[in-house]
């Protein structure tokens, strides 16, 4: 038997051991991989086994070969998870893109709607302007025809308005002048108002317009809308002229017979009475118009006219009921005529230097207010016609309304 060298036996032994070790490593790696796939929660293990390495010269030297099983397992798990996650990711992405596109598309749509509405409104205004421009000659022609048809009523209305403005201005000026007012001017305004009223009724005597002053119907036959408007307008102005004439008569009364303070309350009461009268005097005219308009023959039209007339009466009653508080307050002030203070003593007058702060003259009938400031009775009465506080310290003296105490008359036309 021929003996082999020692190094050959050693090399063959090492090669056998290397093969066995390699098989063992491959078997353990496959077992560990199957174990990782079966359980996702198992911790990763890093397994290092010594593997002999051969040198390039043919001599074998033993070295360590490290195989990282955890990295391979983690890569395999990550790949499997990525396969599971991808469908859900792709499933959500269209919805996100859909929401984004919907929000992006809603903005331009709203802007387009606004621009369309704005352009439509501008075009409508432009078409209206073009229509008015084309229709202006026709409107002018028919307006001229209406003016010619109602030239009498328009002329009378302008004349009555001018008369009212002139008389009202004269009365207010004379009330402001007090003792220095011109009696001749007051008499002239009174005569002017009477002459204007009689001239108007005499000119249209065939229509018997003066009947409406006493809540009767004038003789106009079938009453149309413009006829009712004509009667109510004239009656309203003539009623104002009547009460303005009464104010002129009060102005003619000497101050030693009626004080200026009392005259102020009379002006206020007359104006309140004039407004109530003008509110009521138009009721019979419009009631007749609502019933008799168009010579109603059928029963349905007659019943409809009665219904409208009843509604008109209800509205008129509501208006009168709304003015009830104002009228009652005015009547209470007229009857009581409250004082603004007490008669001032000589000491109070001397403390005020014996001179009224309003008229800058010596006191005449001095009155001491609740704030102890002293003024002339007539001066402080004129002051309280428009104010409610003391002229010096602005202390509230009176809560009452003193409107119309300056002799003015309301221009408001109570047509209905």
Swiss-Prot record:
Compartments, record wording: Endoplasmic reticulum membrane
Principal localisation: endoplasmic reticulum
GO terms under cellular component: endoplasmic reticulum; endoplasmic reticulum membrane
SMART domains per the UniProt record, alphabetical: RING
Keyword terms: Endoplasmic reticulum, Membrane, Metal-binding, Transferase, Transmembrane, Transmembrane helix, Ubl conjugation pathway, Zinc, Zinc-finger
Membrane topology annotation: Multi-pass membrane protein
Biased composition (Basic residues): 81-100
EC number in record: 2.3.2.27
Secretion signal span: none
Annotated pathway: Protein modification; protein ubiquitination
ZnF (RING-type) residues: 356-394
GO MF annotations, alphabetized: ubiquitin protein ligase activity; zinc ion binding
Catalysed reactions listed for this entry: S-ubiquitinyl-[E2 ubiquitin-conjugating enzyme]-L-cysteine + [acceptor protein]-L-lysine = [E2 ubiquitin-conjugating enzyme]-L-cysteine + N(6)-ubiquitinyl-[acceptor protein]-L-lysine
Required for ubiquitin ligase activity and for protection against ER stress-induced cell death as annotated region, ranges: 349-400
Disordered: annotated span: 1-50, 68-117
Biased composition (Basic and acidic residues): 7-19
Biased amino acid composition, Polar residues: 20-45, 68-80
Transmembrane segments: 146-166, 184-204, 214-234, 237-257, 265-287, 302-322
Function: E3 ubiquitin-protein ligase that acts in the endoplasmic reticulum (ER)-associated degradation (ERAD) pathway, which targets misfolded proteins that accumulate in the endoplasmic reticulum (ER) for ubiquitination and subsequent proteasome-mediated degradation. Protects cells from ER stress-induced apoptosis.
PANTHER family: E3 UBIQUITIN-PROTEIN LIGASE RNFT1 (PTHR15860:SF1), UNCHARACTERIZED RING FINGER-CONTAINING PROTEIN (PTHR15860)
Name listed for the protein in its UniProt record: E3 ubiquitin-protein ligase RNFT1
């Amino acid at each position: 038997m021929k003996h082999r060298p020692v190094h050959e036996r050693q090399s063959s032994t090492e090669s056998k051991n290397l093969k066995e070790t390699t098989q063992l490593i491959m078997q353990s790696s496959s077992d560990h991989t199957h174990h990782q796939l079966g359980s996702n929660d198992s911790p990763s293990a890093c397994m290092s086994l010594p593997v002999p390495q051969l040198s390039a010269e043919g001599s074998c030297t033993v070295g360590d070969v490290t195989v990282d099983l955890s990295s391979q397992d983690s890569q395999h798990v990550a790949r499997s998870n990525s396969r599971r996650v991808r469908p859900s990711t792709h499933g959500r992405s269209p919805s996100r893109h859909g929401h984004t596109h919907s929000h992006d598309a809603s903005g331009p749509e709203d802007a387009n709607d606004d621009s369309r509405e704005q352009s439509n409104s501008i075009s409508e205004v432009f078409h209206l302007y073009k229509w008015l421009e084309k229709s202006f000659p026709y409107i002018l022609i028919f307006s001229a025809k209406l003016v010619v048809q109602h030239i009498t009523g328009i002329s009378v209305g302008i004349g009555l308005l001018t008369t009212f403005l002139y008389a009202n201005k004269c009365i207010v000026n004379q009330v402001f002048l007090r003792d220095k007012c011109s009696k001749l001017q007051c008499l002239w305004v009174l005569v002017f108002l009477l002459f204007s009223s009689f001239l108007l009724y005499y000119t249209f005597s065939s229509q018997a317009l003066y009947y409406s002053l006493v809540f009767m119907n004038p003789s106009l036959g079938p009453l149309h809308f413009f006829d009712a408007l004509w009667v109510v307008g004239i009656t309203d102005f003539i009623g104002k002229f009547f009460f303005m004439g009464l104010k002129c008569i009060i102005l003619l009364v000497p101050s030693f017979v009626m004080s200026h303070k009392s005259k102020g309350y009379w002006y206020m009461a007359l104006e309140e009475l004039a407004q109530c009268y003008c509110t009521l005097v138009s009721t019979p005219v419009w009631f007749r118009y609502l019933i008799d308009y168009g010579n109603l023959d059928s029963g349905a039209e007659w019943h409809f006219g009665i219904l409208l007339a009843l509604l008109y009466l209800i509205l008129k009653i509501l208006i009168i009921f709304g003015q009830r508080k104002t009228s009652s307050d005015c009547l209470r002030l007229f009857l009581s005529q409250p004082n603004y203070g007490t008669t001032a003593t000589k000491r109070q007058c001397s403390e005020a230097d014996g001179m009224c702060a309003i008229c800058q003259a010596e006191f005449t009938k001095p009155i001491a207010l609740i704030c102890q400031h002293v003024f002339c009775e007539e001066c402080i009465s004129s002051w309280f016609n428009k104010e409610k506080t003391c002229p010096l310290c602005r202390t509230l003296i009176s809560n009452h309304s003193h409107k119309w105490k300056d002799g003015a008359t309301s221009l408001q036309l109570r047509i209905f």
